């Protein structure tokens, strides 16, 4: 969690201090506990609200000097929109909107978690806390000069006033684990590539041992013995050898079939011999966003002690050009035994995933596999930065991912698969080639991956537009978004986790 912002829960009866934040709907109404907290100043506040351009729209804010009678220095009114229609993600965004109004000078903040109809449920209060922490995260580890008046330099203790503080604290415990998982994923994506290379990434993933996650790290020797020729071909041009990390959380019944998540972890992608243009190449430090998500997800599931068996697997490489680098025209043999003609060395992520998907399918026999990868620019052309591309061989899995995408705000959009696309990756020299035609590039990339899932129920999420550099929003002000952690945590919790 962000060290500079701390959240806790207190009863409504605790006196507000510092900055007071209250909620108001689009009818400009306050709840009873809010009116009581405002005391004799309530009429003054209502007049100020009515006289302003503030309409109570969701996430809107009105910042006021505290009127006489209030023992706080500042009053912030946050709009909820139609309070009765608020969904879980709406409440999370309210928390983010609150964090957005916390200034560098605010050291104590009290938020009255109440809607006009009455107190928020404990789960809603927990969502407010999560939204505050997700919005407050910043990555400034490498800045040697930090400005005290930086709007992002938050250093506040936030007290969330609720009807039942103990119940809210209990509801927040699993949510807090998910927040930590999202922030871990963001940290990994934001790290520079000279710091986070495959061996270092593997070490950081191994820190999940502290939470009870079993860790297995496959080095070059182990991957060579497994005949992971597709992954090793990508990494052979780098001074940093590749790694595959297998994480296992045993939270379900002994022997119960696990669910599995696989992440692409290209720690830096130059394109290899098919080198990329220099413009924005620095962003290719984020080409491991899928692997970052899987590590963050495993943290979340283990920290909240999810009642399910889970495999998390990440393939970690750098794609670099040197005298040992893979060439266009090379033919490699994957772990599956299928041969691949390399047409473009910049279509490397699918090669990494091919071997890791096959390994997981054969070794662990999961109920399903979901892979995440910043795989193609084509998906950004198709969907922009608001949706990840979803490809699947299983309608039920696709429908479930779509449903939790809506509920979490981490949206997906299903794209087609079919034989007419699959034939585009047939090769005259090998079993397949690693790129198809220019058209439908995200689809042919998914068709390639499907050849390595061995009939396992599978979904592929192309997160090129959502994992890094996406537009900032109410709950994320970071370049690395941590996309996918909340989505997949919800998938597990909603459909695959043993109920209490």
UniProtKB/Swiss-Prot annotation:
Instruction: Give the SUPFAM superfamilies listed for this entry.
Output: Macro domain-like, Zn-dependent exopeptidases
How the cofactor is bound: the record states: Binds 2 manganese ions per subunit.
Supply the EC number(s): 3.4.11.1, 3.4.11.10
Cross-referenced Gene3D superfamilies, in alphabetical order? Leucine Aminopeptidase, subunit E, domain 1, Zn peptidases
Q: Where does Mn(2+) 2 bind?
A: 264, 269, 287, 348
Q: Give the positions the UniProt entry annotates as the active site.
A: 276, 350
Alphabetically ordered keywords of this record: Aminopeptidase, Cytoplasm, Hydrolase, Manganese, Metal-binding, Protease
**What GO biological process, any one, is recorded here?**
proteolysis
Show the Pfam families listed in the entry: Peptidase_M17, Peptidase_M17_N
Q: Which reaction does it catalyse?
A: Release of an N-terminal amino acid, Xaa-|-Yaa-, in which Xaa is preferably Leu, but may be other amino acids including Pro although not Arg or Lys, and Yaa may be Pro. Amino acid amides and methyl esters are also readily hydrolyzed, but rates on arylamides are exceedingly low; Release of an N-terminal amino acid, preferentially leucine, but not glutamic or aspartic acids
Which co-factor is required?
Answer: Mn(2+)
Q: What the protein does?
A: Presumably involved in the processing and regular turnover of intracellular proteins. Catalyzes the removal of unsubstituted N-terminal amino acids from various peptides.
PANTHER family xref list = CYTOSOL AMINOPEPTIDASE, LEUCINE AMINOPEPTIDASE-RELATED
What's the protein here called?
Probable cytosol aminopeptidase
Instruction: Please report the organism this UniProt entry assigns to the protein.
Output: Rhodopseudomonas palustris (strain HaA2)
Q: Which gene encodes it?
A: pepA
């Amino acid at each position: 969690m962000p060290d500079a912002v701390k959240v806790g829960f207190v009863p409504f009866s605790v006196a507000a201090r510092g900055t007071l934040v209250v909620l108001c709907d689009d009818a400009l109404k306050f709840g009873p506990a809010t009116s009581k907290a405002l005391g004799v100043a309530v009429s003054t506040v209502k007049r100020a609200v009515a006289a302003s351009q503030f309409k109570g729209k969701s996430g809107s804010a009105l910042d006021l000097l505290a009127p006489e009678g209030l023992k706080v220095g500042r009053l912030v009114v946050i709009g909820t929109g139609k309070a009765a229609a608020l969904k879980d993600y709406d409440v999370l965004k309210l928390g983010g909107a609150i964090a957005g109004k916390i200034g560098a000078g605010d050291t104590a903040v009290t938020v009255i978690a109440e809607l006009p109809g009455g107190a928020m449920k404990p789960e809603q209060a927990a969502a407010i806390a999560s939204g505050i922490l997700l919005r407050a995260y910043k990555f400034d580890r490498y800045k040697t000069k930090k400005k005290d008046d930086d709007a992002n330099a938050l250093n506040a203790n936030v007290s969330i006033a609720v009807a039942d503080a103990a119940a809210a604290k209990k509801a927040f415990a699993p949510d807090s684990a998910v927040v930590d998982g999202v922030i871990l994923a963001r940290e990994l994506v934001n790290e520079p590539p000279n710091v986070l290379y495959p061996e270092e990434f593997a070490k950081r993933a191994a820190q999940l041992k502290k939470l009870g996650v079993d860790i297995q790290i496959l080095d070059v020797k182990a991957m060579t013995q497994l005949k992971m020729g597709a992954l090793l071909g990508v990494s052979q041009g780098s001074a940093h050898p590749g790694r595959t990390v297998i994480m296992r959380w045993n939270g379900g019944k002994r022997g119960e079939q696990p669910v599995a998540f696989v992440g692409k972890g290209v720690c830096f992608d130059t394109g290899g011999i098919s080198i990329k243009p220099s413009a924005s190449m620095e962003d290719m430090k984020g080409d491991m966003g899928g692997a970052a998500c899987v590590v963050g997800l495993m943290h979340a599931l283990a920290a909240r002690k999810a009642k399910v068996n889970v495999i998390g697997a990440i393939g970690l490489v750098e794609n670099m050009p040197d005298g040992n680098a893979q060439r266009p025209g090379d033919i490699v043999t994957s772990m599956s035994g299928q041969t691949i003609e390399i047409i473009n060395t910049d279509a490397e992520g699918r090669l990494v995933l091919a071997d890791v998907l096959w390994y997981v399918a054969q070794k662990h026999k999961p109920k399903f596999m979901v892979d995440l990868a910043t795989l193609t620019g084509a998906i950004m052309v198709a969907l922009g930065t608001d949706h990840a591309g979803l490809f699947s061989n299983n309608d039920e899995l696709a429908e479930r991912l779509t449903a939790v995408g809506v509920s979490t705000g981490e949206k997906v959009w299903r794209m087609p698969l079919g034989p007419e696309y699959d034939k585009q990756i047939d090769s005259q020299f090998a079993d397949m080639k690693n790129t198809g035609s220019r058209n439908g590039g995200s689809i042919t990339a998914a068709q390639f991956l499907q050849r390595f899932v061995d009939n396992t129920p599978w979904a592929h999420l192309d997160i090129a537009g959502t994992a890094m550099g996406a537009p900032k929003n109410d709950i994320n002000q970071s370049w690395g978004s941590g996309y996918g952690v909340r989505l997949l945590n919800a998938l597990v919790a909603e459909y695959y986790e043993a109920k209490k």
